[in-house]
Amino acid sequence: MDYLESLDFPKVVEIVKKYALSDLGRKHLDTLKPTVNPWDELELVEELLNYFARWGEPPIKGLNDISQEVERVKSGSALEPWELLRVSVFLEGCDILKKDFEKREYSRLKETFSRLSSFRDFVEEVNRCIEQDGEISDRASPRLREIRTEKKRLSSEIKRKADDFVRTHSQILQEQMYVYRDGRYLFPVKASMRNAVRGIVHHLSSSGATVFLEPDEFVELNNRVRLLEEEERLEISRILRQLTNILLSRLNDLERNVELIARFDSLYARVKFAREFNGTVVKPSSRIRLVNARHPLIPKERVVPINLELPPNKRGFIITGPNMGGKTVTVKTVGLFTALMMSGFPLPCDEGTELKVFPKIMADIGEEQSIEQSLSTFSSHMKKIVEIVKNADSDSLVILDELGSGTDPVEGAALAVAIIEDLLEKGATIFVTTHLTPVKVFAMNHPLLLNASMEFDPETLSPTYRVLVGVPGGSHAFQIAEKLGLDKRIIENARSRLSREEMELEGLIRSLHEKISLLEEEKRKLQKEREEYMKLREKYEEDYKKLRRMKIEEFDKELRELNDYIRKVKKELDQAIHVAKTGSVDEMREAVKTIEKEKKDLEQKRIEEATEEEIKPGDHVKMEGGTSVGKVVEVKSGTALVDFGFLRLKVPVSKLKKAKKEEKEESSAVSYRPSSFRTEIDIRGMTVEEAEPVVKKFIDDLMMNGISKGYIIHGKGTGKLASGVWEILRKDKRVVSFRFGTPSEGGTGVTVVEVKV
């Protein structure tokens, strides 16, 4: 029984096949089926997806389907010139692809396609022997060149003789011309003059008035031309056979290249699909969790993302809700995504999605049921369910749509509960949809099951297609009837006919839905506030770094000035020592006086500055020669600990002076004034050429403002603009690193860049 078909697996594969380069890739995609070890395929898809994001499309020259040519080689046939050209271009493309992967950092791609064999000698031989238009070149062999040279010389001789014949026999010719037919030069002789020239008649005109004659003097020449043509044909056949034999001698290598390119084409198609559907690679996990999963058969403008998680201590979901509310799509998506992941396909969902490997995936979605149509009968359902129950075990993922429908509700519900119990006892993981109340109640009381429902908007009388976990769904019949104007008296009469338990259950479900709606609204508000908080936090972190950098630069300047002064004093001391060693007493005395005078001047200056205003904790001060204003934390033994906002320094009191009032205010303003520079640019809608100067200017602005991180919004689209931006950043030496944004930063629609500051 083909459960994959009921999950729309073949339809999704058909979508992916549209992105393949050739039939090689399309045939390979048809071979992909769920396996318990899909790691190799998934890792290759992931690496190629990363390759696309950073480098754009890999080189794909000439990677066409040459399966027919390979079969002809295997059968012993010599390939025609155009076939050899086609194979040569293919093999040249293999070489280019292999070399490209060898210089990249993707280990799985490099390892897999390192097995591509080089046919450089064959490619060179084909290029030497065959022209691009398919003609065999004179360079193909010395014998071929010799034959063609002789043939050309002989043809020239025949044409010269033919021109002479026309000129000297004009009276017997119907027209002053000759023709070349079947490798022979013939003359249109009047039938009445047939015997005027000895020769062979090859053709007669339809009117009988003209015979096409080959004069005896041309027979030998024409025979020699025909012989040369036959020799040329044989030599060309020999050359083609020789080229084909190169392929035949390396048939295993050739077939392996075809297989590897088929696999590459399949990977290429899957990556193009992922980029088109904003997909990601999901690797096998120990749990089931869908994050914004989007069914690929639903148009992008209509699809509602599915968010669903099966806790580790649960083994199944019972999903209820109104018809056409999205129940079937939800369970189908779980089964489909599991099958696709196990087959090596990327999935249209967000990061954080997790799926388990199930050796058995079984589903009952009804006969030929599609997402748009829900037609089934009880008997057809039951036939599939019987098969599923027989084969189910702990390795099984079971998808059952509208279990218990198509028959009496009471009996259907009882049967549904019994089937669910049996599947759980066998250890299967189950996803079941139903609208039967007893099944909802059963799920509420079973420790291994979770209820879920499809959200319904009572105001618009339509489903929202959002999954609500933890609460069963209602039919909403009374709400819909009341909204559409049915007499309240009739509605109350209908309610009174429900049992007390049914009324309590409906009331409980309605209350739970209302509470969940409120919680969802609160969750959205909190998420929005969190995003705003993260933006503010990042902004203030950038401001902090900028101000800290400014402070450090100021202190560096002051430190340089201090070092200059120390060097000056040291130089003068060195001079004094030199004088002491070599100079006269008068010179020594003069040097000592100079040093003592400078010492006294320096001490006096320090005393004046220190005594002018006593430095104490809490004072705002500046360093000698500096502009930064700091606050004194403590003073001990003539040294003050000064807080300059983002840096604390111990400074001699003699090197400090009190700051003026306006300097204090300015310092305060500078310390806490956030930058007004925007750390993001939006280049959506631009070409790569238009975006390049904008991106470079943005990097300039980041560095001028002392900001290390910025955001470039380019959108997702085809990925061409993103690839262009990455190429610009890769070449810019001011860029430290760049990456796609996290989901909260905008995902692959945003590039986060870090620059040197």
Swiss-Prot record:
The keyword Hydrolase applies. ATP binds at residues 321-328. Coiled coil: none annotated. Pfam families: MSSS, MutS_V, Smr. Its EC number is 3.1.-.-, 3.6.4.-. GO terms for biological process: mismatch repair; negative regulation of DNA recombination; rescue of stalled ribosome. Residues 681-756 form the Smr domain. Keywords: ATP-binding, DNA-binding, Endonuclease, Hydrolase, Nuclease, Nucleotide-binding, RNA-binding, rRNA-binding. InterPro entries: DNA_mismatch_repair_MutS_C (IPR000432), DNA_mismatch_repair_MutS_core (IPR007696), DNA_mismatch_repair_MutS_sf (IPR036187), MSSS (IPR046893), MutS (IPR045076), MutS2 (IPR005747), P-loop_NTPase (IPR027417), Smr_dom (IPR002625). It is an enzyme of class 3 (hydrolase). One of its GO terms (molecular function) is ATP-dependent DNA damage sensor activity. HAMAP family: MutS2 (MF_00092). Homodimer. Binds to stalled ribosomes, contacting rRNA. Endonuclease that is involved in the suppression of homologous recombination and thus may have a key role in the control of bacterial genetic diversity. PANTHER family: OS10G0509000 PROTEIN-RELATED, SMR DOMAIN-CONTAINING PROTEIN. Belongs to the DNA mismatch repair MutS family. MutS2 subfamily. This is Endonuclease MutS2.
